[in-house]
């Protein structure tokens, strides 16, 4: 299927669009992560970015993509509440890989938010959803518009949570192609790739964290816990960036 034809999927009706996406997802399911990235870089619209939380295993997708497209814009949504170790990790990886880092934030500072709304993360699921909307969803939507993004690479995986185990490799959200190259990778495959390529993990990994977000809504992984229970007090897994 040609690049020209794929770019025009958005002009088709829902049924035809879904049929083509099903065919492409079947194709991508037989590819390796590297082949998926190469295919996407060649066939999907060329205003391309990747997003990264610079979390525990984020180095994997960064490494896979920048080998093929070193100057790809890397979008970071900074809530102002990341761990100090995360900010240091961002600086370290940006310098090491010469990342084309693009940082976006809420138009309301974290201090002003607390003055206006209080500690939203302590106000149940509604407070968390509102917090995520103004600190993550709105800045990401601004970033996608500001950079005129047509194709979005992200590092989601099926085994990360129940909410992610049915995700497709390729989807279209608000007219933007979203590709998940390591969707079928297991934790063991992630660990093997990190070791084989001598890549760095987040500093908090060795302190018992399996997932890292904001300081106030991230817990260490304890025996018997699911990974998704380490975030948002177990009330939810997604921060809103990857929800429909």
From Swiss-Prot:
Name the UniProt key words of this record, in alphabetical order: Cytoplasm, Oxidoreductase
What processes in GO biological process is this protein linked to? hydrogen sulfide biosynthetic process; sulfate assimilation, phosphoadenylyl sulfate reduction by phosphoadenylyl-sulfate reductase (thioredoxin)
Coiled coil regions, renumbered to chain: none
InterPro entries linked: PAPS/APS_Rdtase, PAPS_reduct_dom, PAPS_reductase_CysH, Rossmann-like_a/b/a_fold
Q: Which residues cross the membrane?
A: none
Q: Please indicate if the UniProt record lists Cytoplasm as a keyword.
A: yes
State its location(s): Cytoplasm
- Known catalytic reactions: [thioredoxin]-disulfide + sulfite + adenosine 3',5'-bisphosphate + 2 H(+) = [thioredoxin]-dithiol + 3'-phosphoadenylyl sulfate
The answer on whether this UniProt entry bears the keyword Disulfide bond reads no
UniProt-listed CDD domains: PAPS_reductase
Protein family according to the UniProt entry: Belongs to the PAPS reductase family. CysH subfamily.
Its annotated function is as follows: Catalyzes the formation of sulfite from phosphoadenosine 5'-phosphosulfate (PAPS) using thioredoxin as an electron donor.
Which named protein is this? Phosphoadenosine 5'-phosphosulfate reductase
Q: Which organism is it from?
A: Buchnera aphidicola subsp. Acyrthosiphon pisum (strain APS)
Query: Coding gene?
Result: cysH
